UniProtKB/Swiss-Prot annotation:
Main location class: secreted
Residue ranges, annotated region (ABD): 336-499
Binding-site list for substrate: D219, N222, N223, G296, H416, N418, F419, D435, H463, E465, L468, D488
Keyword Cell membrane part of the UniProt annotation: no
Top-tier EC class: hydrolase
Name of the protein described by the UniProt record: Alpha-L-arabinofuranosidase B
A Pfam family reported for this protein in Swiss-Prot or TrEMBL: AbfB
Active-site residues, Swiss-Prot/TrEMBL: E221 (nucleophile), D297 (proton donor)
Disulfides per UniProt: C21-C31, C81-C86, C176-C177, C401-C439
pH dependence (UniProt free text): Optimum pH is 4.0. Stable between pH 3.0 and 7.0.
GO cellular component labels: extracellular region
EC number(s) on file: 3.2.1.55
Induction text: Expressed in the presence of L-arabitol and L-arabinose, and repressed in the presence of sucrose and glucose.
């Protein structure tokens, strides 16, 4: 006699390269929303995965799989975005329900962009390969969010649903709330039980699990649950995987959290049982909107990286989810390269020269804690030469990228704070390390390098009125002006004035 799982596997064997949503369909819990910038989630899907907008002329284009059911056409993105910046403006729904994710509007909390909207994600912050083919995930800095408040077919009230997401288990924080899933249609907090979304992070304000985090939890509104009880649940382990599969499902008086390494192995069940015994959570009052990277009320202080995810109609069986996990592992997610162009070498000492016409005698330097540009040459004072010289070290937050230590103030590094570049002493915190890590890429104007913030990949080293900022190509800050952006973010790497 065949088990349900064996029957499911036999049924799928007749389907060439069945995708996650084919597997859910075979398990009688079809996808009602399917989002990914890396690959098709149905074997037959060949439509648009996501939309890009480039900074040079605000033109948009869509990126589709190379073949039906295949990997995203990263080369089309690279060509479209060459010598400029690109944002991900839409993440398309592959299910046919039109549940596309777009820039999240203001709600209980305003976002940092124009009119209170959240920021859009850089198109190049999360490069990966799937089975050796290049693709890009969605690297979401604090303030970034996507949403659909008019979704079709998603669970409402106490209806059953399932969901999974493939996330970066090393990119997180303790702010509210890096979510993917079901939320309020008003972008406001309408009470306990009005959400059911995957959360990844190390917040301990509501629930938390074993160790120091991060944890997969469920955001049910007004609480993050790691198990049956509010607060601590020992069965929810800390996550250490670079690529994480997070799976959540909920129905009438039942719900579950499951998780796994998305690169190998099988799903583990961290909780499966009755709804929390607190007011508002049984029955649930789900509203059916879809969020990514934010809380239901547009809380937008969290960070994380999203590669793919779906929401289903009905409560998926463990066997169905196990088969989806096998499919994810078979996709072979591997970290891609964050750097391009002229290379830095850890341990070398450099000076960085401005390339903007009319300013090419100026170098990145500092005056006390202010990072600025100053005119420097061989006749300058020893003090100024040292202030304009930087020791390159392996990135404090990411070993692919780099941090820049002051020659004249050892132990102090260039970091961004409120998007100004400052010279501050390394305090050893995760926040400082992320603020002080920058990824070089081929200069946007073709001269040298452009230095992109690892933690805010829409933002680059930019000189503006002779002061250095972490600036975006267009934005709400004065120093985000598009005028001369490519020149202002491009620097020649030269032999240091001092060492």
């Amino acid at each position: 006699m065949f088990s349900r799982r064996n029957l499911l596997a036999l049924g799928l064997a007749a389907t060439v390269s069945a995708g996650p949503c084919d597997i859910y369909e075979a398990g009688d819990t079809p996808c009602v929303a399917a989002h990914s910038t890396t690959r098709a989630l149905y074997s037959s899907f060949s439509g648009a995965l996501y939309q890009l907008q480039r900074g040079s002329d605000d033109t948009t284009t869509t990126i589709s799989p190379l073949t039906a059911g295949g990997i995203a056409d990263a080369s089309a993105q690279d060509t479209f975005c060459a010598n400029t910046t690109c944002l991900i403006t839409i993440i398309y729904d592959q299910s046919g329900n039109g549940n596309h994710l777009t820039q999240a509007p203001p709600g209980g909390f305003d976002g940092p962009d124009t009119d209170g909207y959240d920021n859009l994600a850089s198109a190049i912050g999360a490069p990966v390969t799937l089975n050796g083919q290049k693709a890009y995930g969605v690297f979401m800095s604090p303030g970034t969010g996507y949403r659909n408040n008019e979704a079709t077919g998603t669970a409402t009230g106490d209806e059953a649903e399932g969901m999974y997401a493939v996330l970066d288990g090393t990119h997180y924080n303790d702010a509210c709330c890096f979510d993917y899933g079901n939320a309020e249609t008003s972008s406001t907090d309408t009470g306990a039980g009005h959400m059911e979304a995957i959360y990844l992070g190390n917040s301990t304000t509501w629930g938390y699990g074993a160790g120091d985090g991060p944890w997969i939890m469920v955001d049910m509104e007004n609480n993050l649950f790691s198990g049956a009880d509010e607060g601590y649940n020992s069965g929810d382990p800390s996550i250490s995987y670079r690529f994480v599969t997070a799976a959540v499902k909920g129905g009438a008086d039942k719900w579950a959290i499951r998780g796994a390494n998305a690169a190998s192995g099988s799903l583990s069940t961290y909780y499966s049982g009755a709804r929390p015994d607190y007011s508002g959570y049984n029955p649930m009052s789900k509203e059916g909107a879809i969020i990514l990277g934010i809380g239901g009320d547009n809380s937008n202080g969290a960070q994380g990286t999203f590669y793919e995810g779906v929401m289903t109609s009905g409560y998926p069986s463990d066997d169905t989810e196990n088969s989806v996990q096998e499919n994810i592992v078979a996709a072979k997610y591997v970290v891609g390269s964050l750097v391009s162009g002229p290379s830095f070498t850890s341990g070398e000492v450099v000076s960085l020269r401005v390339t903007t016409p009319g300013y090419t005698t100026r170098y990145i330097a500092h005056t006390d804690t202010t990072v600025n540009t100053q005119v420097v040459d061989d006749d300058s004072s020893t003090t100024l030469k040292e202030e304009a010289s930087w020791t390159v070290v392996t990135g404090l937050a990411n070993s692919q990228c780099f941090s820049f230590e002051s020659v004249d103030t050892p132990g102090s590094y260039i970091r961004h704070y409120n998007f100004e570049l400052l010279l501050n002493a390394n305090d050893g915190t995760k926040q400082f390390h992320e603020d002080a890590t920058f990824c070089p890429q081929a200069a946007l104007n073709g001269e040298g390098t452009s230095l992109r913030s690892w933690s805010y990949p829409t933002r680059y080293f930019r000189h503006y009125e002779n002061v250095l900022y972490a600036a975006s190509n267009g934005g709400v800050q004065t120093f985000d002006s598009k005028t001369s952006f490519n020149n202002d973010v491009s620097f020649e790497i030269e032999t240091a004035f001092a060492s």
